[in-house]
Amino acid sequence: MFRKLFKTFAIVLFLAGSFTGKVISSELTFFTIGTGGTAYTYYPVGGMIANAISKPPGSRECGKGGSCGVDGLIASAVSSRGSVDNVNAILSGLRNSGFAQSDVAYWAYTGTGTMKGKEPAKDLRTIAALFEEHIHL
């Protein structure tokens, strides 16, 4: 599990690197990550990702105890009711990103399953698979 989490952080940091550049203090970018309930796994993982990619103005330099994140980015993990809530929040513009189980993300992309009757979310993208999850009936 640690190996998958490490790979995820590496991917997120790589993707975040495309936003780098010097930032004037007035040029802040806020980035929200929809997670899950605060008592469950996804909320602290979202917090770790947010901390890894954030680098507000005035932060210590990377390598001197500071964040090596994206200059001017302030990311935050936001608790939610889970996958469907996160996908709906992304589609409405309330959140920038969020965790979703693969079946829910697929349904949103295709307009099927729990998202039947809604416009397919063809702009929805997967950044990484964090956990292997099995659904039991």
Predicted feature descriptions by range:
Residues 10-19:
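Sec-dependent N-terminal signal peptides of Gram-positive bacterial secreted proteins and lipoproteins
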Residues 26-137:
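Short, glycine-/small- and polar/acidic-enriched structural segments
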Residues 19-25:
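Sec/Tat signal peptide C-region and signal peptidase I cleavage site
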Residues 1-10:
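Bacterial N-terminal signal peptides that target proteins for export
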